[in-house]
Amino acid sequence: MVRIAHISDPHVGSPYFVPNLMNRVIEELNEMRPDVVVCTGDLTNEGYRQEYKNWVAYRDRIKAPIHTVPGNHDARNVGYLHFEELIGRRDWTAEVKGVRVVGVDSSEPDLNEGQVGRERYGWIREVFSEPAELKIFALHHHLLPVPGTGRERNTVADAGDLLEVLITSGVNIVLTGHKHVPYVWRIEDMYVANAGTVSSLRLRGYTKPCYNVLEFEDDEVKITRRYPFGGGSVIAHFRLSTGEQYHRELEPPVQQRRTPTARQGE
């Protein structure tokens, strides 16, 4: 079995960052012993060097290999330079027991919006062209809109073109972060799993800090949402070969009040 932990948006340096949550998640990850940890960005709050160094102190306590893409907060204040020095490459590939994971930087300096860009499409197709039991793509920004996240400026600007590249490349799962709302979409045979914030109280509606765990064995994939200090639920469970979907459980991530219509108010 391959186990991949997906964490996102710790926001070290934010007044809403909770060290106790991050410490607990590190303990849980080390007990779980995943084959790899994928972090989809916003390690920092403002991209400052000291925030990066503080994140590295947490990261270095995680025993599993960890691969990271930058988020929009990490690209602030020329923070992408610190990312390259202290974290590593912004675009990368990783192989884990027949699973190929590809990460790409979708951030733009000092902008909240993001894009992947056509100059990367050829490389993405190339790295996914070799056979793999499971193909995973990771980026920070949303690939598809997520309910309860406000105006749709949170997807990458080139989402349509990128979707075409990923689907035609046979990608099975996309991992994203950004707006702190956990959710899963299915489009054709590809699943898009968004993670919440792992250690921040910048929460939308009634969501809670959480992270995802992906388990893959014998053609079967299970994605579980876990909460620090206990609890969680399976949010997707399916077979790759048949597309058969055993389970998809999504709680309403953001409580939305029903607005009375004019007639109801009369």
Residues of each region from the PLM?
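Beta-strand-turn-beta hairpins that frame and shape the catalytic cleft
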Residues: 1-5, 93-103, 129-136, 186-192
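N-terminal active-site segment of His-dependent metallophosphoesterases
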Residues: 1-54, 58
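Active-site neighborhood of phospho(di)ester-bond hydrolases with catalytic His/Asp-centered motifs
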Residues: 7-8, 36-42, 66-72, 105, ...
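Active-site environment of divalent metal-dependent phosphoester hydrolases
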Residues: 12-16, 45-50, 72-79, 109-112, ...
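Extended active-site neighborhood of metal-dependent phosphoesterases/phosphodiesterases
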Residues: 49-130, 161-167, 212-213
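Short acidic, glycine-rich surface-loop motifs adjacent to enzyme active sites
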Residues: 131-148
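Conserved beta-sheet core of the metallophosphoesterase superfamily
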Residues: 151-220
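A short C-terminal boundary segment appended to hydrolase-like catalytic domains
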Residues: 216-266
